[in-house]
């Protein structure tokens, strides 16, 4: 989970409507609050939400809360321990990230006349400058959610790979900082980004044991590994030996979902999916949030006082073998068939085919949906498909309404500047994504959606970018502020550090 600050320019600087000493500006389309010293076109460093500034950087720029002997604040606004960048509202206006002048990095270049401005240019991304750590992904430190879990889940830690062809799913980068990745002729699709825990299952060559010669036995060597086709399941970073223990106290909720693919995957297939809802003890898979902390009455009126990312699941719903009966056809009568809501559910977002030489073929989204329909599993909801024209405009089909229309960033937003065909496609794609990235979750309909994922279909390798809405970013920040532990994916990042 890489995190960077971006050297960029501050645009659309304007007065804050509710604060005389503040201004608003835009970075990558995100609104930031700045003081009156900032100006249009100023070059600086933008730190997106969900990052953590280093102690050195925050101290050098007087960002940490500090009180004098009389209890008066003489420092900044950041918690000295967390130092996290989060989405907030200041006097009723969005502030989505942190923008600082480029001079904030001058201390990294003491021997360079002119400081950071002589070294860094617009477009650079930074996490370390001249040997000085600047920022990293913010991950709350702590133990697993269930301190009585009796240890973490057992994962395979051997010199020989258990499933050498079982590939991890790469992190999905932010759309706003990768607009240049889009080109005329690209085909795209926009799907729902779901807030859950990642899982993957493959039908691949799996380690079954070792062939030991007499020499191996004498010298106590393991011998030559023996592989045969079998099913293997893991989280984003680990391969699971079993479903005991783990971050959630038990990984039992994962088991039924992995078994669903047994007898259904073709040889060489790997399926990547999001698990949402609740664990077998009824705890939410992802953190909950008190919506009143947003100080937004309209949000509370729309989504209630508590956000639980349930996606239509029930904490007391069916699980285990009962859950399998929901998905696997059987000969039971309608009277005995399970009708309760699931305790957790899965949504597939990617599938691959890997041959025995390790060559990976990426399934197109349409073929992935075809295979999932054959297997009886759900895929992430599809919002729209489109193609970028040579003009840079996006011809989009809204799959919710079957409406066909064109999305573009027009001349009026560029104040008369000529259209840049190199950059316009990405801007058009971002605008298209923002048609769908906010509002109630289309699955459960009781909480805000996280955002969307924009995938470029015509690339040989999986190429996709996420775009989260502001309300979710604020919720995510509040959840992390009060968290005693990172979420599942972030917990694994800590383990891998």
Give a label for each model feature.
Residues 1-497:
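Core nucleotide-handling region used for phosphoryl-transfer chemistry
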């Amino acid at each position: 989970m890489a995190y960077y600050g971006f050297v960029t320019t501050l645009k659309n600087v304007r007065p804050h409507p509710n604060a005389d000493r503040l201004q608003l500006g835009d970075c990558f389309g995100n609104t930031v609050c700045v003081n009156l010293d900032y100006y249009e076109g100023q070059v600086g460093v933008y730190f997106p939400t969900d990052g953590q500034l280093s102690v050195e950087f925050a101290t050098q720029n007087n960002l940490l809360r500090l009180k004098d002997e009389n209890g008066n604040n003489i420092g900044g606004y950041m918690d000295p321990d967390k130092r996290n960048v989060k989405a907030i509202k200041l006097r009723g206006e969005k502030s989505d990230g942190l923008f600082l002048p480029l001079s904030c990095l001058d201390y990294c270049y003491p021997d360079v006349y002119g400081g950071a401005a002589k070294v860094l240019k617009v477009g650079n991304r930074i996490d370390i400058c001249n040997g000085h750590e600047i920022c990293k992904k913010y991950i709350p430190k702590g133990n697993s959610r269930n301190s009585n879990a009796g240890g973490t889940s057992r994962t395979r830690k051997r010199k020989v790979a258990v499933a050498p062809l079982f590939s991890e799913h790469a992190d999905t980068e932010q759309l706003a900082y990768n607009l240049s990745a889009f080109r005329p002729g690209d085909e795209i699709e926009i799907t729902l980004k779901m807030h859950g825990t990642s899982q993957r299952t493959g039908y691949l060559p799996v380690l079954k044991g070792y062939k030991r010669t007499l020499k191996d036995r004498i010298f106590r060597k393991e011998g030559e590994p023996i592989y045969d086709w079998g099913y293997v399941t893991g989280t984003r970073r680990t391969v699971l030996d079993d479903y005991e223990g783990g971050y959630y106290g038990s990984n039992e909720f994962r088991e039924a979902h992995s078994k669903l693919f047994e007898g259904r995957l073709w040889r060489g297939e790997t399926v990547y999916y999001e698990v949402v809802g609740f664990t077998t003890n009824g705890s939410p898979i992802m953190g909950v949030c008190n919506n009143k902390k947003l100080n937004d009455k309209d949000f509370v009126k729309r989504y209630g006082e508590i956000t639980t990312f349930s996606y239509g699941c029930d904490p007391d719903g069916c699980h285990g073998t009962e859950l399998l009966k929901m998905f696997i056809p059987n000969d039971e009568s309608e009277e005995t068939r399970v009708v309760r809501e699931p305790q957790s559910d899965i949504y597939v977002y990617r599938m691959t085919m890997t041959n025995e030489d390790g060559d990976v073929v990426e399934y197109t989204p349409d073929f992935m949906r075809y295979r999932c329909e054959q297997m009886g599993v759900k895929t992430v909801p599809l919002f729209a498909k489109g193609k970028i024209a040579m003009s840079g405009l996006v011809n989009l089909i809204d799959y919710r309404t079957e409406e066909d229309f064109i999305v573009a960033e027009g001349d009026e937003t560029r104040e008369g500047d000529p259209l840049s065909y190199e950059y316009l496609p990405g801007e058009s794609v971002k605008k298209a994504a923002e048609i769908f990235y906010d509002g109630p979750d289309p699955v459960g309909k009781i909480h805000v959606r996280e955002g969307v994922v924009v995938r470029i279909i015509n690339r040989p390798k999986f190429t996709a970018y996420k775009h989260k809405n502001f309300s979710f970013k604020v919720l995510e920040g509040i959840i992390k502020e009060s968290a005693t532990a990172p979420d599942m994916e972030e917990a694994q990042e800590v383990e891998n550090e």
